[in-house]
Amino acid sequence: LFAAFGLHPMFMDEHRDGHIGALQQILAERLDDPRCCAVGEYGLDYWGKNADRNAQQQLFEAQLQLAVDCRLPSLLHVRRAHADVIATLKRYRPARGGIIHAFSGSPEEAREYHKLGFKLGLGGAATWPQATRLRQTIALLPGEQLVLETDSPDMAPAFHAHQRNSPALLPQIAKELAAL
């Protein structure tokens, strides 16, 4: 098993001032452990109208700085916030890149992430026929820029609609995405 440690933006109400210090301590204690593989999942989530963008940005930058300092890749949650995430990554220039979890952006955003050393995580959402823009974007990208992920038990693929998602579905997801 491998571990990544981070403070997710969907739980902003639960994060406290001391959490960044605690995260820094956790990472420092595990830096020599090869099972500590990344900082994450963290990022920006602008989906809700009540999203505190300033607080999220501060938490995002603090964790990105930890990733840079620890020389660890980042697992990033990005929802309706690609422009801000890309701009921030350009300022910090993390040497290890990482993965954009559940990528849903444009071809231009995909290219920017690639330049910054990030791969794009794809899973069940990309198998849905109504995900037209995402499917068109995937078709334009080189396979080595993509990473399969399940986000189990959530984000089930179209062929397994309204059921619990599972890593066992990855071969079929890969087949469907390869056909694009």
How would you label these PLM feature ranges?
Residues F2-A4, L75, I99, G121, ...:
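Structural detector of well-ordered beta-strand residues that form the stable sheet scaffold
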Residues L7-P9, S104, G124-W128, S152-P153:
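Short, acidic/turn-prone active-site loops that include or flank metal/cofactor-
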Residues P9-L116, Q136, L141, M155-A168:
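Divalent metal-binding pocket/active-site signature
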Residues G117-A131:
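His/Asp/Glu-enriched short active-site or ligand-binding loop at hydrolase and phosphoryl-transfer sites
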Residues G143-T150, A156-L180:
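His/Asp/Glu-enriched, well-ordered alpha-helical/loop segment
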